[in-house]
From Swiss-Prot:
Signal peptide positions (record): 1-27
GO biological process, one term: glucose metabolic process
Main location: secreted
Function: Hormone found in the sinus gland of isopods and decapods which controls the blood sugar level. Has a secretagogue action over the amylase released from the midgut gland. May act as a stress hormone and may be involved in the control of molting and reproduction.
Lineage per the UniProt record: Eukaryota, Metazoa, Ecdysozoa, Arthropoda, Crustacea
Gene3D superfamilies hit by this protein: Crustacean CHH/MIH/GIH neurohormone
GO molecular function: neuropeptide hormone activity
Record-given protein name: Crustacean hyperglycemic hormones 1
Entry's Gene Ontology cellular component terms: extracellular region
Highest rank taxon of the organism: Eukaryota
Length: 120
């Protein structure tokens, strides 16, 4: 009888931990990266806002620029890449190098204009 209770309590504890872990995981972590691009509610205003960005606050543009930095970090796995890429509201050499490396040439001008819109 005590063995049954012990197994039962371990099973309940495991289920409780699974429930807590699944409820605290962000929706973006469970979905592919492209799935969250169209949903504005996946990013809060505070998570996208950078005080150095004094231009137009456009979530879609900020998300697109941030994605370049995230992808660049995933390729190079250097800790400073993600932060340096976003510094000065994406108007820096690291962002330009990431853009050159990751994006097709026909998208470069579009991203340069986005940096100008959200930047200074």
């Amino acid at each position: 009888m005590t063995a049954f209770r012990m197994v039962w309590s371990m099973l309940l504890a495991s289920l409780l931990m699974l429930l807590v872990a699944s409820s605290t995981a962000p929706a973006d972590a469970l979905s592919p990266p492209a799935a969250g691009l169209g949903a504005d509610h996946s990013f809060t205003k505070r998570s996208l806002f950078d005080p150095s960005c004094t231009g137009v606050f456009d979530r879609q543009l900020l998300r697109r620029l941030s994605r370049v930095c995230d992808d660049c970090f995933n390729v190079f796995r250097e800790p400073n890449v993600a932060t340096e890429c976003r510094s000065n509201c994406y108007n820096n050499e690291v962002f330009r190098q990431c853009m050159e490396y990751l994006l097709p040439a026909h998208l470069h001008e579009e991203h340069r204009l986005a940096v100008q819109m959200v930047g200074k």
